[in-house]
């Protein structure tokens, strides 16, 4: 059973601030986190709230897909063959290098690098660099290097996406 008064307060906070954690909701509602977590679990089970990676939100309708103008020229997205052996990774904020990045390192030992797509700040854009650039992380030095200009862009990286450059499994290569 979900308490309607608490649900109303939580829903109002989520609409105002967007996704929030249990701790933040408990603080704003002046509740103990231990009490809030039980309420949130019940609300998620009842379908009145959603939870993803510890963040709670009110259910929102999915945006309708845009109208495709040249539908006859391009195959439908549902017909696409999705790659199920490449790892899908989230964007990493800033220029910190998580331990996960070392799993994607390639090259000779002590000269390893990780290929990325990096978003750079306005200062680099003013110098003629595009907003998103192919780059690599020199694991040994902890530096971000632009692949096209070979500039050290470490201090200018806003966020980056690690690229999985591992070889395709043998079964996939035989089909291609």
Swiss-Prot record:
Q: What induces it?
A: Expressed in the early phase of the viral replicative cycle. Expression of early genes is repressed by viral Repc (latency) and favored by viral Ner protein.
* The entry's keywords: Early protein, Host cytoplasm
What main location does UniProt list?
host cell
GO CC term, one of those recorded:
host cell cytoplasm
Where does this one sit in the cell?
A: Host cytoplasm
Q: Could you tell me what this protein is called?
A: Uncharacterized protein gp11
């Amino acid at each position: 059973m979900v308490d309607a008064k608490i649900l109303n307060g939580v829903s109002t906070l989520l609409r105002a601030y967007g996704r929030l954690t249990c701790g933040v909701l408990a603080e704003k509602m002046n509740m103990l986190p231990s009490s809030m977590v039980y309420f949130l679990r019940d609300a998620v089970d009842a379908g009145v709230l959603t939870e993803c990676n510890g963040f709670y939100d009110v259910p929102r309708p999915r945006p309708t897909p845009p109208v495709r103008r040249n539908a006859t020229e391009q195959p439908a997205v549902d017909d696409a063959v999705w790659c199920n052996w490449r790892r899908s990774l989230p964007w990493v904020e800033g220029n910190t290098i998580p331990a996960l990045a070392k799993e994607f390192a390639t090259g000779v030992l002590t000269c390893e690098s990780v290929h990325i797509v990096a978003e750079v700040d306005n200062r680099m854009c003013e110098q003629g660099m595009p907003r998103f650039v192919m780059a690599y992380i020199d694991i040994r030095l902890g530096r971000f290097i632009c692949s096209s200009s070979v500039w050290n862009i470490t201090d200018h990286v806003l966020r980056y996406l690690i690229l999985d450059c591992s070889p395709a499994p043998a079964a996939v290569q035989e089909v291609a």
